Amino acid sequence: MGVARSVRMRTKSLFAAALTVSLISATGCSDDSESDDPEDSIFVDDSKADDFYSMSAQEYLVEGKSTIVLDASFATKTVDERLREAKRIVGLKQIAIAWFMTQYLVDKEHDDPNASFGGFGGMAKAGAYEDLEIRERADKLTFDFVFRQTAAGGKNLMMSLPIRVAGGKQVFDLEIGKPSNAQMNELETNHEWYRSAPWSGWNPSTASADQKEKITFSIVKEKVSTDGFFDIARLTADGKLDMDVFFGWDYHSDYHLKHSKQFFTWLKEQGFRSPTTSWDTLTPTSGAFTKTVKADGRDVKLEVRIYFGKPGTTTDPDTDAGGKLLENIALESLKTRDVIMYSGHSGPFYGFAIANWKKTEEGDLDDADIRVAQMPADRYQVVLAEGCDTYQIGTAFKENPNKAGKNIDIITTTSFSDASSPAAVQQFVSALIARDSTGRLRPQPVSGLLTKLDGNSFSFQSLYGMHGIDDNPKLVPFAKSGNFGKTCGVNADCGGPGNLCVSAGTGQGKKCTAACASLGESGCGTGYTCKAVASQASSTIYGRACAKL
């Protein structure tokens, strides 16, 4: 990738990553992937449960007014021609607004040229634009418009911004850059206008008056999404769950080599059969690590493949040929695999840097590539974008025409990520293949994984989140809803993992139900609601289950 300016460093944690035990411990999964549900479950009344559900990030709706001016030659064009050109330029201006807003909100490294400008752990969601009220002025060249964009940051973002109240709205002022129409039109991949000074590393304090304009942005919190399960039933419907992992080139300490080797060892420790005797002999054609598990009474084959740039081989990350091979493998993965994982460097308006971008323009998948990549339209896929500031990649995947916002889940960050270990990849795989003590897949809610990912770094906040969760199952996959309400003695009486035998209270006996993801959310069916459940022995809430109204 020849645009190193846009690639953010992944930060090395000052402390070793560690996992913590939470009150809802069953929503996660340990490294051995065992996840048994307690046999002494009891429903907890709403008034007795802590009213607390947390994810680290929040989306916000940002709105403002701006102006564009057409080339003088359009003064003699028809109304329709002028409006058509105005809409085109407004689209380019939306990209510019998103870029400069991201430059303000995003966290900075101490040596960044604009390290003193903003830095709130936030980003604009590139691509999530709305153009409102485009109006032509009397000169027939100037058009005013209202824009609306989505941004993301920590839940306290609005407390951190220099907010004031105007017209009954919470607003903040920001000086953005004023590239010309011709400059904004320069969007060739890897050579976009915003990758050059003074727009890259934007800092209005160092820009001349004719290079900037002040815009007032209103900001409100977006509607909060609720928890859901990874749709393991769909991922395993064909009897196989295949996963590809890409470790991007790293300049910190060759972490693409170290982490791929650690992950190789970890897979073997999890009981996977290795395709080769050692990491040293692993090549792109070695094949998959394999393991067979049970899912809803069926055998399911797990396959995991590892890819990274290895010096002196066909995937040498310093060469065009090596980078191109890695890029082609990644594109094939997006086309054919259930799960695609990337761990490496990234940044705003960027994507996956698999090869050494300092030496080759090959071996990268940026947001523009992702939007047009061949992906299956009717197949559910899950993507992990583990790197700094990958939030915008979520929109790129959802806007791929073969996905159109469906059949895709993408986990991203809105701030730094930890470069010191492959823990995030291991936790992600563990969540997808979480099993009970008999080796049966036990689908997990997304919140458990996000909590673990956020906990990997102690010197900074990563702000992980998942795009696409609104259409994920709220009822645990493989739930036997036909057994709801039947008398039971143990969980196994009600079905496989995730089906529970729960007491409604003292003297009321135990009835069959199943795990659910969000309190009060639909998914349980008519006559049921989702309530917290606790282990009577430990007196701790461990999850949620469908309760009869």
Regions found by a protein language model. Give the residues of each.
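Bacterial Sec-dependent N-terminal signal peptides
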Residues: 23-42
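Long, solvent-exposed N-terminal ectodomains/accessory regions
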Residues: 39-146
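Functional beta-strand-loop-alpha-helix junction segments that form "active/interaction loops"
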Residues: 252, 265-334, 455-462
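Cysteine protease catalytic core and zymogen-processing segment of caspase-like enzymes
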Residues: 317-410
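Active-site-proximal C-terminal subdomain of hydrolase catalytic domains
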Residues: 381-481
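Secreted, cysteine-rich disulfide-bonded mini-domains of extracellular proteins
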Residues: 480-549
